[in-house]
Amino acid sequence: MVTKIICQGAEAKIYLEEDKIIKQRIPKTYRNQILDEKIRYSRNKKEAKILYKAKKLNLDVPKIYNFNEKKQIPQDKDKLILEYINGEKLSDFLDSYSLKKQMNIMKKFGKQVGLLHENDIIHSDLTTSNTILKKNKVYIIDFGLSYISKKIEDKAVDIHLIKQALNAKHYKNYENLYLSFLEGYNSNEKKEILNRLEIVEKRGRYKH
């Protein structure tokens, strides 16, 4: 069985092992060992529970394999074993598609995010780097920063992130892509969230 590292961040190393992703949280040597273990386990548990919840809601996210459904905790304290989504990362491929296909993809992406928010799941890192197209489905990955919140502000900030990402990375068709995202984004709180988004953006401009 071949295992290779495909990514390393500040918090975790990501390995590919056949058709599975292993996310191994990195120990922090500057922290007290017992405290570090607690922090890593807490973050591991939170990410696992949110991924499990999203999958149960039939959202297009990776399956989690090492999760104890009965106890609602991961079976490992510092790693997650996830489904490998072998598709096209949108940050690399979106601009190469026809405009019609790009807009259709963004509409699907918006629908997925709307379902996350309907169930109070905040992703916190919504970019096309964390979105993969596979067999005409749009998968959202990397829930490492995700959390549960009912706050309109938090949902608005989530949308602000994808809006910024589109403007920075896919600026050529930015307006069409963002409008397509909003077309797909359905939530009972959509009006309130978009109103709050305007406030968030004004606040950001004021800071700069």
Model-derived segments and their meaning:
Residues 41-44, 62-106:
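Conserved structural core of kinase catalytic domains
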Residues 51-59, 93-129, 134, 138, ...:
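Conserved kinase catalytic-core helix
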Residues 69, 86, 128, 145, ...:
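Short, glycine/acidic-enriched loop or turn micro-motifs at the edges of active sites
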Residues 5-45:
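ATP-binding glycine-rich loop module of kinase domains
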Residues 16-19, 24, 66, 84, ...:
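Conserved hydrophobic "DFG−1" position in protein kinase catalytic cores
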Residues 139-208:
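C-lobe/activation-segment region of protein kinase-like
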Residues 1-15, 59, 189-195, 200-201:
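Nucleotide/phosphate-binding site architecture used for ATP/NTP-dependent chemistry
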